Amino acid sequence: FTVKRSDIRFNCEIPIFLKLGIPLALQELLTNISFLILCAIVNGIGLEASSGYGIAQKVISFVMLIPSALMQSMSAFVAQNVGAGKEERARKAMLTGMGLGVCVGVLIFGVTFFRGDLPASLFTANEAYIMRAAEYLKGFSFEAVLTCIVFSYIGYFNGHGMSLPVMLQGITASFLVRVPLSYVFSLKEGAS
């Protein structure tokens, strides 16, 4: 089995992959940049806030595995059903995913809002850092419910090959809501 340079060439499906993939890759890149900006904002508040934020982000990484899995499986399931001409089944799957997302989101909300100190204590024994992480997780808890629902909707759009609206939503959430509000709140006296 040999591979020659003439065996490597572009085919007609590459533009389709780029049309779907570039918006998703750009959204992922810009979302991660927005979290780096948030990290810089929090670092300006002080060591305890910065450490608490870092710990909370570790907890959130685990929490976000669930909505991310929902989104990715929804995307594949919807794409298969749309390709088979079963749009109604794809829509029902999205609604089921949203319902499942609500159940999971409420559970995550309960833990992160009422007992954010428990998952934070898995990463450190420093009480001040745990308290700061719990404060951050309390604020995140509402987003956890929303994210579990919205990610099913995003998977539905991605499954339809509509990655541009998904990208626009992600960039809007990051740079028109999350970063500006974080900056404004960080300027308040006693920001945490």
Give each language-model segment a name.
Residues 24-27, 39, 76, 155, ...:
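Small-residue-mediated transmembrane helix hinge/kink sites in multi-pass secondary transporters
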Residues 108-112, 165-191:
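Alpha-helical transmembrane segments of multi-pass membrane transporters
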Residues 53-116, 147-169:
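Small-residue-rich hydrophobic transmembrane alpha-helices
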Residues 9-37, 41, 62-66, 70, ...:
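Hydrophobic faces of transmembrane alpha-helices in multi-pass small-molecule transporters and flippases
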Residues 4, 29-62, 80-81, 118-127, ...:
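Helix-terminus/linker motif at the lipid-water interface of multi-pass membrane proteins
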Residues 1-22, 78-143, 186-192:
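Short alpha-helical transmembrane segments in multi-pass integral membrane proteins
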Residues 27, 31, 35, 64, ...:
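Alpha-helical transmembrane segments of multipass membrane proteins
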